[in-house]
């Protein structure tokens, strides 16, 4: 048995939300289906969600029913990593600071920013990417003694060379020894 479906420009799908923050639960945005300018009742189509629990891109498949049975549409939405909450910044050795965090199993890498400017602008701002999600700490050297540094971190999920970012953690201030 072989079915042929038209992916028709007149058959459009709009999602109520384009992006969710990972929370460990299945995500199902509300779907609105239109044919031309007419909004269809849900009795004229079925919705199937795929990969809609973990971080990454989820797929939404809409299949018409009844007189719309030959029509189908596909769209997607993102599930981004949650904000990093348990971070620690310490300076116990001169001109060094260590940033540590709780590993996010949904992430593939981390980005750390540190700066002498609390707005993370200017020449003292540095951005470092940690490419392995198994790493849980990083020590930075060559810093200026007796200066305050501001640090924030976020997790990243890489899917098909596209990056999904969590929001930045709360900024932590540390005085470097």
Regions found by a protein language model. Give the residues of each.
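Surface-exposed, short loops/turns at beta-strand junctions within beta-sandwich domains
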Residues: 51-56, 140-148
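Solvent-exposed, low-complexity, repeat-rich "mucin-like" stalks and linkers
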Residues: 4-38
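Predominantly extracellular/luminal cell-surface or secreted proteins
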Residues: 34, 113-117, 154-156
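Beta-strand-rich modules
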Residues: 142-160
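Pro/Thr/Ser/Gly-rich low-complexity, intrinsically disordered linker/stalk tracts
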Residues: 81-106, 163-177
């Amino acid at each position: 048995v072989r079915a042929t479906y038209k992916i028709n420009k007149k058959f459009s799908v709009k999602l109520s939300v384009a992006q969710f923050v990972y929370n460990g639960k299945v995500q199902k945005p509300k779907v609105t289906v239109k044919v031309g300018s007419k909004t269809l009742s849900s009795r004229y189509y079925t919705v199937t969600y795929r990969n809609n629990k973990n971080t990454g891109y989820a797929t939404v498949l809409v299949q018409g029913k009844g007189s719309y049975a030959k029509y189908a549409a596909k769209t997607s939405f993102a599930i981004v990593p949650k904000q990093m909450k348990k971070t620690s910044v310490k300076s116990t050795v001169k001109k060094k600071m260590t940033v540590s965090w709780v590993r996010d199993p949904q992430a593939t890498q981390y980005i750390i920013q540190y700066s002498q400017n609390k707005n993370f602008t200017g020449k003292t701002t540095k951005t470092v990417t940690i490419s392995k999600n198994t790493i849980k700490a990083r020590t930075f050297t060559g810093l200026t003694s007796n200066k305050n540094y501001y640090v924030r971190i976020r997790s990243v999920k890489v899917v098909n060379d596209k990056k999904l970012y969590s929001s930045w953690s709360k900024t932590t201030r540390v005085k470097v020894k």
